[in-house]
Swiss-Prot record:
GO cellular component terms given for this protein: archaeal-type flagellum
Prodomain residues: 1-11
Example GO BP: archaeal or bacterial-type flagellum-dependent cell motility
Protein's recorded name: Flagellin B4
MF terms in GO: structural molecule activity
Organism annotation: Natrialba magadii (strain ATCC 43099 / DSM 3394 / CCM 3739 / CIP 104546 / IAM 13178 / JCM 8861 / NBRC 102185 / NCIMB 2190 / MS3)
Principal subcellular localisation of the protein: other
Stated family: Belongs to the archaeal flagellin family.
Keywords noted in UniProt: Archaeal flagellum
Cross-referenced InterPro entries: Flagellin/pilin_N_arc, Flagellin_arc
Function: Flagellin is the subunit protein which polymerizes to form the filaments of archaeal flagella.
Localisation: Archaeal flagellum
Amino acid sequence: MFVNETTDDRGQVGIGTLIVFIAMVLVAAIAAGVLINTAGMLQSQAEATGEESTDLVSERIDSTTAVGIVSETEVSEEAGADRGELEEIRLGVSGAAGSDNIDLSETIIQVVGPQGQDNLVMADPGDDEIDANDDGFVTVTDEDGNVDGDSTDATDADPSHIASGHFAVENEDGNFVEESDAVLDNDNGELTIILNPKVAPFGSQISESDEELDLQDLDTEDAFGAGDESSLSIVSPSGATTEVELNAPDLFSEDGEAVRL
C-alpha cells in the first residue's frame, strides 16, 4: 500500500542560455578591465596635475623691488631732449615662500613696452671675459661709439651693453653673474634682474646695432623714461608667472637718482 515516488527529472540548460551566460561573463570582464585602465589613467593625470600645481607654487618668483636709475647724461635743449630717461631698470627678485631652487637662466620675461613686445632671456657674460665680437649679449664700445675689438671683464660691463631680447642678473656685490650662478636658493636669497631701457621693447634702439643710443636724435631713438609704462610677465621654468607693472614718474627731479617704478 506504500507508494514509492521516484523522480527521474533533471535540470537542463540549453546551449543558447549557456552561450549568453558566457558572453555576459566576458562582457563583465572586459568592462572591469576598461574601468581599471580608466582609473589608472585618471590617477596618473591627477598625480601629474598635482605635481604641476605644486611646481607652480614652489617655483614662483616674487618681485621685491622695481626701480629705475636716471641717466646722468646731460643733453641740451637743442638736442631735442624734453624729458628725462633711464639708464637702467633694476628688478629685485626672490623665491616665493616655500619655493624650491629657481634657475633664472631658464626664466623668460615677457615684455610689453612703449616700443612693442618681446621675450627676454638671460644674457650669460661667459666664464671670464665677454668678447665684443661674439653674437652674444654684451657689446663693448669706445667713447666714439665704435666697437671695441678687445674684450672686457664681465664685471666691468654696464646695463647699456645688454642687447634687446636679453636681461642680465646681478648679485649682491653688484656684479653680473653667469648662468650657473643665477639661481635663487638658500645662498642667493635675492638677485637683481637688470634691463636696458634704451633697447626695444623699452626704447627704440635697434638691437643689432653696435652703437650706443644717439642722444642727439631722441625723436627717433627714444629711451624708456618719464611717464612711460611697461608690463612684465616673469615666467619661471615651471611656468609660474609673476606680473610686474612698471610706471615711471612724470618728472625726474635729479640725474643719477633711483626712482620707484
